[in-house]
Design a protein with these regions (language model features):
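Positively charged n-region of N-terminal signal peptides that target proteins for export
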Residues: 1-4, 230
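Sec-dependent N-terminal signal peptides
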Residues: 4-14
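Sec/Tat signal peptide C-region and signal peptidase I cleavage site
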Residues: 15-19
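N-terminal beta1-alpha1-beta2 submodule of the flavodoxin-like/Rossmannoid cofactor-binding fold
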Residues: 20-96, 108, 177
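Helix-loop-strand module that forms the ligand-binding subsite of alpha/beta enzymes
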Residues: 67-152
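Glycine-rich phosphate/pyrophosphate-binding loop and the adjoining helix
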Residues: 157-185
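Residue-level detector of functionally pivotal "anchor" positions at catalytic/ligand-binding pockets or at interdomain
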Residues: 183-205
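C-terminal tail/sorting-segment detector
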Residues: 219-230
């Protein structure tokens, strides 16, 4: 009974903290070669966000030459809107939405415009944060995403060279710090038993835990979030 009361008290504190500072975050991305996916997953990891992959109904070819010099170039010239594979994500659940993609022909791929203009999605009132991966430069890609969401608030975007997208944790952290996203609570976190230590951790009895390293299985409140170690 005492444990139940203490857990309820801790969760009440969590809810109060989230009501004041908590925002739900979604990372959305389109990736062809995997570089943008790696960057998106790093953003998700550091923000504790949900993640959603944007995919075309008809998958793009794996052949770079065909994709670069025929398909993507033609889509841009025709201002095409490739059909989306699905529209399953519910944007109403989120306050901050990251939108990421590779740079194709100096701009965002047309599939990104399909996503941002989809009638099933409403970005009005959301905070949209663009990011991209590129071979030479980001060009107008970040602005493409901003211009396609005129009724949203926007924060500084991030462009990273594709070859560095797999080793970008420090660049992502510095960027998230600059735009004040790092401290936003995204929801309940499930962690594995090898979770690293955190600044504020309490067990179900309300006792401060010095370190989460090698912590036994159970329910904890870590940095204001309910955390389950399995």
């Amino acid at each position: 009974m005492k444990k139940t009361f203490l857990l309820a008290l801790l969760l009440t504190i969590v809810v109060g903290m989230q009501a004041q500072t908590g925002k739900k975050i979604l990372v959305t991305y389109f990736s062809w070669s995997g570089g943008t996916k790696a960057l998106a997953e790093e953003i998700r990891r550091q923000t504790n966000a949900d993640i959603y992959r944007i995919e075309p109904l008809v998958p793009y070819t794996d052949d770079y030459q065909t994709l670069a010099y025929e398909i993507s170039n033609k889509e841009k010239e025709e201002n095409a809107r490739p059909a989306l594979k699905d529209t399953l994500v519910t944007l109403n659940d989120y306050d901050y939405i990251f939108v990421g993609c590779p740079v194709w022909w100096f701009d965002a791929p047309m599939i990104i415009h399909s996503f941002l203009e989809c009638k099933d999605y409403n970005f009005a009132g959301k905070t949209v944060i663009p990011f991209c991966t590129f071979a030479t430069a980001s060009y107008d890609t970040l602005n493409d995403i901003i211009n396609a969401t005129p009724n949203s608030t926007h924060l500084e975007g991030l462009g990273i060279r594709g070859s560095q997208s797999y080793t970008n944790s420090s660049a992502v952290k510095n960027w998230l710090d600059r735009i004040d996203i790092s401290d936003i609570v995204a929801g309940i976190t499930n962690v594995e038993a090898d979770s690293k230590g955190t600044d504020r951790a309490y067990n179900i009895n309300g006792v401060r835990v010095a370190s989460m390293d090698n912590a036994p299985s159970g329910i904890y409140i870590v940095n204001g979030q309910k955390t389950v170690i399995k």
